[in-house]
Amino acid sequence: RTGGGAINSGPDLGDVGGDGIDAAVHEPADDRGTLDHAVSHPDRLGRLLSVEMTLTNGGSIPHSIDFHAARIAPDKAFRDAMPGESFTFRFQAGDPGVYMYHCGTKPVLAHIANGMYGAIVVSPAKPLPKADHEYVLVGSEWYMTTDGIKAPASLDMAKARAMAPDWVTFNGYANQYVTHPLSSKPGETVRFYVVAAGPTHNVNFHVVGTIFDRAWANSDLVSPPQRGVQTVVVPAGGGGVFDVKINDVGTYPIVSHAFAHVDLGQVALLKVGKPKGSMSH
């Protein structure tokens, strides 16, 4: 099974996987961008042995899907689906971690910049330490022909090639978790699964006011985690898993510590307990 849901309002990521259960993942693509659901929708595979993927292209141009979690010949599995075409491939999800998937059709820059990406979590056979809350944050940037507020807006390829975004976001919307903060209680462990979808910029992941108790850089859930880490670079196309346990009631900004990104919307708030103060980040 696969799971999760639109995460734009910041719900926890539930574990809907199980040992040895096959997954049938259906991702109809169209030219408007995204893959059959809201930008950055997370899928949780939880200790799967085999994944079956069916790509149906309902658009007017070729599309494909590239799973970073797969060990498979890309010329067979990640090939273009022509308009109206549907095909299926299978892969073994044997490497635990949080991975990006995205449209890999040329120009890849344009397809990712149009929102055709997401995150997939593969849980390890030996469970990670218990977390009270789990959140998926997918960083990306947007290059718009308008300010992105008034529709319609479309991709500005000149801006994309110049790496000059109008907005930088978590899960597709600038500042959404400032308006709708994530939450936990004092003493609870919060786990963040972070993917940098790019298409170009990294996420310099940092939580203001605390230090990561555990950090699995590069989404390596096989090796022991780093401990006592302040900021970890999640490269474009990469992932990372981060645990924090916060005892003090308060509001904790979650940022990419490249502060141009914060100014352009890549900031979230984690409210621990019922804080009364505010932050200026």
Regions found by a protein language model. Give the residues of each.
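Short linear motifs in low-complexity or flexible loops
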Residues: 2, 6-11, 15-17, 22-24, ...
